[in-house]
Amino acid sequence: MTNQKQTTHFGFKSVDWNEKEKKVAEVFHSVAKNYDRMNDLMSLGIHHLWKRYTIELSHVRPGQSVLDLAGGSGDLTRLLSQKVGDSGQVILADINAAMLHVGRDRLLDEGLFKNIRYVQGNAQCLPFADNSFHCITMGFGLRNVTDKDEALQSMYRVCKPGGKLMVLEFSTPVFPGLKPVYDWYSFNILPKIGKFVANDEASYQYLAESIRMHPDQETLKAMIERVGFEDCHYHNLSGGIVALHIAYKY
């Protein structure tokens, strides 16, 4: 870690730097079983459109190597595996063992195994060689990382020259009038859905808080460029509720 005596945020709470990783792990161990169902309910299924849009802009080709970081239950990995074909490879990496097992079991049940590997690893110190991947995707995971700068540096290291980084993450609404409605939904409805469906209100309260604490579009763009990626730009989806940042390593 950058500074083990430092504090950071866990939702709206201030916690010890080393404590956040443990608390986030507890959240995702708790939500893993109901993760897909909750995503569908919370977004009314729109998260599938955001992910398909990400894959469309990836321009991943057969034979390429792709890292799906914080790949969770495997939505992006499934789509990427179809793009790279049997001659390519997708590595689904996640720090959380419970989420990794959910993703692996789900994709195996769908008959997807020829070109997919599973790795449990920390985004801040990725266990891969330099210049390994043509494309790195990270869907709804960066806001949970303790040291985002360190994670982005690690992604830059393992990205091939000419490769691409794609970060799909909740962001700051830009559509006029959307933010107060979104805030009301996030803090009044999401935790109740979590309590009703998964008997876990606290984890979804953290979800809402973690979104508010995540850097906005321009701040994240600057962070990505600061570690060495170039030509970073972003697409606001659903009025900025979600943003897709794309950047390149030259």
UniProtKB/Swiss-Prot annotation:
Coiled coil: none annotated. GO terms for molecular function: 2-methoxy-6-polyprenyl-1,4-benzoquinol methyltransferase activity; demethylmenaquinone methyltransferase activity. Pathway: Quinol/quinone metabolism; menaquinone biosynthesis; menaquinol from 1,4-dihydroxy-2-naphthoate: step 2/2; Cofactor biosynthesis; ubiquinone biosynthesis. Pfam families: Ubie_methyltran. InterPro entries: SAM-dependent_MTases_sf, UbiE/COQ5_MeTrFase, UbiE/COQ5_MeTrFase_CS. It is an enzyme of class 2 (transferase). It catalyses: a 2-demethylmenaquinol + S-adenosyl-L-methionine = a menaquinol + S-adenosyl-L-homocysteine + H(+); a 2-methoxy-6-(all-trans-polyprenyl)benzene-1,4-diol + S-adenosyl-L-methionine = a 5-methoxy-2-methyl-3-(all-trans-polyprenyl)benzene-1,4-diol + S-adenosyl-L-homocysteine + H(+). Gene3D superfamilies: Vaccinia Virus protein VP39. Keywords: Menaquinone biosynthesis, Methyltransferase, S-adenosyl-L-methionine, Transferase, Ubiquinone biosynthesis. It comes from the Bacteria. S-adenosyl-L-methionine binds at S73, D94, N122, A123. PROSITE patterns: SAM_MT_UBIE, UBIE_1, UBIE_2. GO terms for biological process: aerobic respiration; menaquinone biosynthetic process; methylation. Its EC number is 2.1.1.163, 2.1.1.201. Belongs to the class I-like SAM-binding methyltransferase superfamily. MenG/UbiE family. Methyltransferase required for the conversion of demethylmenaquinol (DMKH2) to menaquinol (MKH2) and the conversion of 2-polyprenyl-6-methoxy-1,4-benzoquinol (DDMQH2) to 2-polyprenyl-3-methyl-6-methoxy-1,4-benzoquinol (DMQH2). PANTHER family: 2-METHOXY-6-POLYPRENYL-1,4-BENZOQUINOL METHYLASE, MITOCHONDRIAL, METHYLTRANSFERASE. This is Ubiquinone/menaquinone biosynthesis C-methyltransferase UbiE. The lineage of its organism: Bacteria, Pseudomonadati, Pseudomonadota, Gammaproteobacteria, Legionellales. The gene is ubiE.
